[in-house]
Amino acid sequence: MDKSKQPFRKSKRSFRRRLPPIGSGDQIDYRNMSLISRFLSEQGKILSRRTNRLTLKQQRLITIAIKQARILSLLPFRNNEKQLERVESIPRTTGPRTKNK
């Protein structure tokens, strides 16, 4: 068969399947902080299932574990870096106030 008459064919490339983020030995539990923290964003939000590459059941278990850890105050509800910064206080004056013109 002539090359111009051949149907379009995709080149067969071998691809390497990525390892699942949760191994068979990993236990999804609210006390397993090293596992849970992998599925949180920098702001402390739960990452989506597509981002995590988890199955539906795994994502549900991760979500429940994160929520339990938040309620038991093992995890913060939000990571606010601004909240930790302190603003310098303005010194108070004890004398009478004067108006500036």
Curated annotation (Swiss-Prot):
Main location: plastid
GO molecular function, one term: structural constituent of ribosome
GO biological process: translation
Superkingdom, taxonomy of origin: Eukaryota
Annotated InterPro entries: Ribosomal_bS18, Ribosomal_bS18_sf
Compartments reported by the entry: Plastid, Chloroplast
Keyword list, A-Z: Chloroplast, Plastid, Ribonucleoprotein, Ribosomal protein, RNA-binding, rRNA-binding
Biased composition (Basic residues): 1-19
Region (Disordered): 1-26
One Pfam family recorded for the sequence: Ribosomal_S18
Quaternary structure annotation from Swiss-Prot or TrEMBL: Part of the 30S ribosomal subunit.
Family assignment from sequence similarity: Belongs to the bacterial ribosomal protein bS18 family.
Name listed for the protein in its UniProt record: Small ribosomal subunit protein bS18c
Protein species of origin: Phalaenopsis aphrodite subsp. formosana (Moth orchid)
Protein's gene: rps18
